[in-house]
Amino acid sequence: LVGSEMCKETDYLTAAGEKVGVVKVRLYRPFCAQALIDAIPDTVKYINVLDRTKEPGAQGEPLYLDVVSALKGSKFDAVPVNGGRYGLGSKDTTPAQIVAVFNNADKERFTIGINDDVTNLSLELGAPLVTTPEGTINCKFWGLGADGTVGANKNSIKIIGDNTDMY
């Protein structure tokens, strides 16, 4: 996985007793195969690789292909490696979608985040899942560019940080 998705969901599931994990790729190129192999526990049963891109005409997405190549000939050579897409079309990735990936760990190819009516690879989702700690306040701001949103948000953050204990 490249990006910030999955961390809260993985913590949530492991706290509930599930045996799941995530490897976050922080530097993609050059790809370090040995670092990946070292990060995977010997008890792994499935490896699902999430790519935030679609490569039409390719055998798979970039990270998926690199993971398959890295594991070839290693002690994980027999572990199934499955590839999925997420975040296509700038769609947000929700906790329920991440849980669907874990619940469908044996599915060879999949898509989350969009209704994939072309390849029909979308995973079925369960009920919405809330992984945010109680008492957390979330805000989402949209800007159109040059409309002052960035400056207004900086000021809001300063006000909240200076005048409340919510930081």
Give the label of every model feature segment.
Residues 1-7:
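Short, small-residue-biased leader/transition segments that mark boundaries at the very start
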Residues 46, 50-132:
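Peripheral docking tails and interdomain loops at the edges
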Residues 39-42, 74-76, 130-136, 161:
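Solvent-exposed alpha-helices and their adjacent loops that cap or buttress functional pockets
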Residues 12-40:
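Generic long, charged, amphipathic alpha-helical segments
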Residues 138-159:
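Conserved phosphate/anionic-ligand binding catalytic regions in large, soluble enzymes, centered on
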Residues 9-11, 33-35, 58-62, 92-97, ...:
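Short acidic, glycine/serine/threonine-rich loops at helix termini
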Residues 9-22, 73, 158-166:
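Short helix-loop-beta junction
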